[in-house]
Amino acid sequence: MCTDTIPVLAYVKIELFFADICYYQRINPKPITDMAKKIAEQLIDTLAESGVERIYAVTGDSLNEVNEAVRKNNKIKWIHVRHEETGAYAAAAEAQLTGRSGCCAGSSGPGHVHLINGLYDAQRSGAPVIAIASTIPSREFGTEYFQETNTIKLFNDCSYYNEVATTPKQFPRMFQSAIQTAITRKGVAVVGLPGDLAKASAVSVDSSVRNYFTRPEVCPSEEDLILLADLLNSHERIT
């Protein structure tokens, strides 16, 4: 091989190498990190866009970032209650009275346990409620950390959606799923939010995070209506 062609071949290989990198980046785009916005702020923005106007909560250490995000956002009010149970009941009542999603929050440990009664009421009443269960730092999971609770086990029976956020990239789509579930199924959606994730930089995603405000209705068939009418008409005393 002529030595004059070696630099040319090396140049071609380098060009092909960078072309491969560019192609890979096009089909595997990196998420865009918004260094100016935290996950907690992204959470509050998403709630506001879905029509939530108030968060009923008791301030706690793991909820500090969410509390601060509410302060910066002028679309949502932080309603400080004396007990998380009261906050959960208030969120359920607001959802039933207004038709919009209610929202409550509780910090790790007692704050989670106190939400239970109100969330059961919302779930059984068909009230769309989003519960933010802020948790201990994710690096402390499974270490018997102070006031650690297993939110999946704790809220599983009183919710249609119950997951724990783990990464900034996952959070936007996950939170949208939680809100959409509460709206569509008219019940409780619980989102576990580790304290360290709440203060992490937010990430934009390519997939849609829009919520759709559907109003599903159950309509019995004509045959069932006729059967019910005949049953009622064939008896003199109906309770």
Identify what each model region corresponds to.
Residues 3-11:
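Intrinsically disordered, low-complexity segments enriched in serine/proline and basic residues
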Residues 11, 23-25:
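Low-complexity, intrinsically disordered or signal/transmembrane-proximal segments
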Residues 34-239:
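N-terminal alpha/beta PP-like core and its mobile active-site loop of ThDP/TPP-dependent enzymes
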